[in-house]
Amino acid sequence: MNKKKVLAVALALVATTPSLAEKAIDDSSKVREIDEVIVISQPKEQFLLRHQPLSSNVYAAGQMMNLGVRDLRELSSFVPNFAMPNYGSRYTSSMYIRGIGSRINSPAVGIYVDGAPLINKSSFNYHHFDVTRVDVLRGPQGTLYGMNTEGGLVRIYTKDPMNYQGTDIKLGMGSHGYQLLEASTYRKLNSKSALMLGGFYSGQNGFFRNEFNGQRADKYREGGGKMRFVWRPGTQWNISLGAHYEYTDQNGFPYGKMDLEHNTTANPSTNNQAKYRRNLVNSALCVNFKGNCFDFNSTTSYQYLKDFMRMDIDYMSTDFLLMEERQLQNAFTQELVMKSNRNRFWQWTQGGFFSAEWLKTNAPVYFGSDMNKFMSGTIRNAMYNAMVRSMSARFMRPGVTAEQAQQQAKDMIERQGGVNLDINLGTVPGIFRTPSYNLGLFHESSLNLTERFKVTLGLRYDYSHLSIDYLTSAKMTSLANIMGRKATSSIMSTLQNKAHNSFNQLLPKVGMSLDIDHVGSNIYAVVSKGYRAGGYNIQMFSDILSAELQKNSSQRGDYTVEHDAKAYKDIENTISYTPETSWNYEVGAHLNLFDHKLQLDLAAFYMQVRNQQISVMAGNYGFGRMMTNAGRSSSSGIEASLRGQAFNNNLSWMANYGFTHAVFKEYVDNVSTTGNMKAMDYKDKKVPFIPAHTFSASVDYRIPFNSMLKAITIGANVNAQGKTYWDEANSYSQAFYALAGAHATADFGRITVDLWGRNLTNTKYNTFAMGSLATGKMYYFGQRGNPFQCGIDLKFHL
């Protein structure tokens, strides 16, 4: 079955299911709002998500189990206009919503877990455990949630031990060495307090081998634990303390060389095996008080991250470049929120937010023997050509052509011993301290002008301050033999300085909602502003230092490159990038149809983006990725979501579609072509890494039994996306592709057995691709998507 057949089957399922619902119009099926069924305390919002002027999707634990979702990367495949591709490692957390996204540095999509924000982007990609509900909000959420929610927001909620009791154990195993163990217990200590304790282990041998050393290129092992204590000393108080620890050890970044002509991607083949290890702690204290006129909520969180990454950044078996990165992060956040709790003409929310992040990054770059040979050859050729030009001028005389003069110069150089050069670049160490602080003050009012029509007005003042304190250096030693004369030299460059910057923004929001019937259907329009913080590119320093060394390669003896205030100011301008801002214009509808047997959500949007932040290879040599600002871009599109129930709620189905047209409106960049810099205009080119189309569908049918076997559920799903361009020039891309999955679940009450399969048709596709000039020649690399996999999960509830 090819991908076209997969899509045809999925569309047929979706098309026929509404008719089944109409035929069974007299049954008891109802599609209920998930945030009505799984009630979560919301300290900021006044209304359920489908009664707000925004586009969103909500996923409950049972639905995610049927889809086979284990983390946010896998869930993103079933959310319209949301992409979080599965590539690299847990370090990688690239997320894109509506053409807005980020591969490095400041995120464009925020994540909250049980009401507390995750600060460091390196902590976004983690194992989902004990999750009861996930909300995905599309479009800027800056008024209530601040900077770095320009594309949208993901809210993850875990089980509350006051509402959920018992012990859950989950065992899983599957092909490619997949293993899973999760155990958690939920107990009420008394009528006012409850405790949750849990732990997990997960592992997989991986899908790809490193052709150079035979190791599994993407194997992983991870484990951790969590706790949550809830105390309700009175009817008005709710206090929750939670902590989560996770350790990850994996081989990562299995990027193989691409053949663009034949559209193939090879297995990875690197002489240095890429690795990633991470210790991650997230903790939060939430205090909620329900007063007579208002609710008060305080959320205090602390986050700790310590990781190690090793990446062969030439991505080949040759010994060019190796990068390591060690991050040590401590972060603190505090948010205070008050909101009215009476259903009156005026309902309001207001509060303040503060965060502080202290981040130390140790990021050395190692130059291998092949890089030394490459640099030696490059500089040697430059010296040789300069000597030939200088000497040939002296041989010019009447009757001698320029070619003859050049040949005479070359012959003389060779007779005198030629030009030979051996260079050793060694290691470029780098220690970077980048603390950042953020302050936000916000207010949002909802005015119920009539029974059916309400207006939402919001405004946030957001201030951020960031700084960098860096120490890095590079040394190039050379042994030259020029026409029989030997000379040694050493060129040293040390960069040590501090810089800081501050940004502030006003983030307004204006929304309108109109109820169009008496069953909760409504239409809406909203205008809002998004904001993404600026920052510093620490991976630029290797390129800056290498350029300095090459520029001064003709110096003799021992030479130290000096830097004055102007030089450091130029460096600051080189490594910094400015904030990205956007305006979002959106209209939509939330419709309840056929007596609540069908839900339909529609949205159309247009976004204007200024100073769009784009991840590109750093400078001429490509020693790392850097963030740069494009001039202007725009993004427009649509979203549609359908959910339905039939046959007394035994049949459930959904379908989602998203379309995004994201293009540069003004972006001119200097690119290296055969050693020369050339201005490249990317106007009207598609923004890279953004799928133009996203589609997903699923159907599950539950067959009840009156025996020890309570029910059997059979389900199928499909998700698809593309076309996705991989660079600003739109020179190569991933075509539209589809992945099919299925599962069969047997429910024995306290025991559940689930058989599952993913990528049933073994579709070939890439989740990521890029070009690299690290070796002096442009090569393209990509990571293939995971092939077919199947397995079994056993769940016990005691």
Where does each model-flagged region fall?
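Membrane-embedded beta-barrel scaffold of Gram-negative outer-membrane proteins
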Residues: 286-311, 522-526, 539, 545-628, ...
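Gram-negative outer-membrane beta-barrel transporters
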Residues: 339, 343, 349, 353-355, ...
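Transmembrane beta-barrel wall of Gram-negative outer-membrane proteins
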Residues: 166-168, 173-204, 208, 212-250, ...
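N-terminal periplasmic "start-of-domain" segments of outer-membrane beta-barrel proteins
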Residues: 31-65, 93-94, 109, 134
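C-terminal beta-signal and adjacent terminal beta-strands/loops
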Residues: 37, 359, 372, 531, ...
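Short acidic/polar hinge/loop motifs at secondary-structure boundaries
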Residues: 114-140
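N-terminal periplasmic accessory domains that precede
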Residues: 72, 95-99, 112, 148-170, ...
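Solvent-exposed loop segments that connect transmembrane elements
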Residues: 209-215, 253-269, 314-321, 364-429, ...
